[in-house]
Design a protein with these regions (language model features):
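Aromatic sugar-binding surface patches on proteins
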Residues: 130-144
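Short beta-strand elements
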Residues: 165-183
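Short beta-strand/loop motifs in extracellular/secreted proteins, especially
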Residues: 107-109
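A short tyrosine-centered beta-strand micro-motif
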Residues: 150-161
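Acidic, glycine-rich catalytic/binding loops that coordinate metals and/or anionic ligands
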Residues: 12-97, 104-105, 114
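Short hydrophobic beta/alpha edge segments that flank linear recognition/processing sites
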Residues: 1-12
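Solvent-exposed serine/threonine-rich low-complexity stretches and specific carbohydrate-binding patches
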Residues: 121-132
Length: 183
């Protein structure tokens, strides 16, 4: 049975859901259903261990990533359908993109695109974040060279560092053939 809809409204940056739990007509906090007067928190919870573990806040979560033949907007990435066209040897551009949530202050993202021979085609390092970012879209790419994109596997590497430490890394690729991509 459908309970409601999840979506964007107002100035929100990502779909989210507000949940109210009621007990005997009163709203209760499911994370601290019976707080002690004057206490900042309680270990009591309405969640079983499995649910509590699933609800833990996760930092730096990869939502999706891919390759395109053009720079995509956040809206386009959010609405991509399975089987969207991938770059071919004659695509106007080759663009790698990554959508993340939960980035933290001090995070620096770097996205690097490598050609089939391993050379760096494009690289972008974003400045360190001054505050947490609910959602981000990173893109890197190049326009097609005159003879077209050489056939082979193109690799993108996305990395986040914070305080000099790598805190997240992901590599993905697409194979570009003379007539069509092969994932």
């Amino acid at each position: 049975e459908r309970l409601g809809l999840v979506g964007l409204s107002g100035l929100t940056e990502f779909p989210h859901l507000h949940l109210t739990v009621r007990h005997q007509g009163k709203a209760v906090d499911p994370f601290a259903p019976a707080p002690v007067a004057g206490a900042c928190g309680s270990d009591a919870t309405l969640w079983d261990a499995a649910a509590a573990q699933a609800l833990v806040y996760r930092r730096r979560v990869l939502l999706n990533h891919g390759f395109s033949d053009r720079a995509l907007t956040m809206s386009e990435v959010e609405n991509l359908a399975a089987g969207e066209p991938l770059p071919t040897s004659q695509s106007a551009a080759l663009v790698a993109w990554v959508r993340m949530i939960g980035l933290e202050p001090g995070d620096t993202a770097q996205l690097t695109l490598h050609g089939p021979d391993g050379t760096v085609i494009a690289e972008r390092r974003q400045p360190a974040l001054e505050r947490a970012q609910a959602q981000s879209l990173s893109l890197i790419g190049r326009k097609r060279p005159a003879p077209g994109w050489p056939s082979g596997t193109y690799r993108a590497q996305y990395q986040i560092t914070n305080a000099g430490q790598t805190v997240f890394s992901h590599t993905f690729s697409v194979r570009v053939a003379a007539d069509a991509p092969v994932n």
